[in-house]
């Protein structure tokens, strides 16, 4: 496993996005209910955020709860919403200590009022922090995001000939956030699950078999080290990139 000291800090991805997969399977392996896996995942979140701060990552987006997750058993959904409130209450002090700003993206009106209120309180308390921005994707799906962006464009009377990539980007939830440089997905699945589809056009993907509750700072370093081994071309040839064109 790579250590933080082994990472070239001048080539750290500015924005790391993470699909935190495997909580339920981890819990079943421990012969517990799925919610136990979500509760145990908080250690992985804390370790990963603190690791990102130490590495110099400026933005980290965690796929926390998708719009499709509303279809899960009601007891699990209710437990997740309560866990979200508890996590925010417990971690605000740590976010302040690490100078991390918290923000959210997604269809937030679907969240229970108590969950939304506590999240907004934490966002207000941390809004002046500058070391890292931690983005929680809550009640989020990329297709929903793109659809709501198009609705806003139509509502403002913008004509088709005046719509380009930058227009659409302006109306996305992430308009003030750079696109992810690196996507990490834990749990062994090889898909992006309706997450940041527009934003990940040139993102490097890293998949690991590690279930999310077992993910630690050294695992984050492994992903970043693999990212640093790759050549990002953005449509150019290898020769052009090496020539600095």
Regions found by a protein language model. Give the residues of each.
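Flexible, compositionally biased loop and terminal segments
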Residues: 1-245
């Amino acid at each position: 496993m790579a250590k933080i000291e082994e990472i070239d800090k001048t080539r750290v991805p500015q924005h790391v996005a993470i699909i935190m997969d495997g909580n339920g399977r981890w819990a079943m392996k421990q012969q517990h209910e799925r919610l136990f896996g979500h509760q145990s995942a908080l250690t992985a979140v804390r370790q990963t955020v603190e690791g990102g701060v130490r590495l110099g990552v400026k933005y980290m987006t965690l796929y926390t709860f998708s719009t499709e997750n509303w279809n899960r058993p009601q007891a699990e959904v209710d437990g997740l919403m309560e866990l979200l409130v508890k996590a925010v209450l417990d971690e605000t002090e740590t976010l302040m200590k690490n100078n991390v700003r918290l923000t959210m993206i997604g269809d937030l009106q679907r969240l229970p009022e108590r969950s939304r209120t506590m999240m907004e309180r934490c966002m207000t308390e941390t809004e002046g922090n500058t070391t890292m921005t931690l983005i929680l994707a809550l009640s989020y799906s990329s297709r929903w995001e793109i659809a709501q962006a198009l609705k806003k464009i139509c509502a403002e009377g913008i004509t088709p000939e005046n719509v380009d990539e930058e227009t659409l980007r302006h109306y996305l939830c992430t308009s003030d956030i750079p696109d992810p440089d690196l996507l990490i997905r834990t749990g062994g699945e090889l898909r992006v699950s309706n997450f940041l589809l527009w934003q990940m056009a040139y993102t490097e993907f890293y998949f690991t078999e590690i279930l999310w509750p077992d993910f630690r700072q050294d695992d984050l370093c492994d992903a970043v080290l693999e990212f640093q081994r790759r050549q990002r071309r953005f449509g150019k040839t290898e020769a052009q990139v090496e020539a600095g064109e």
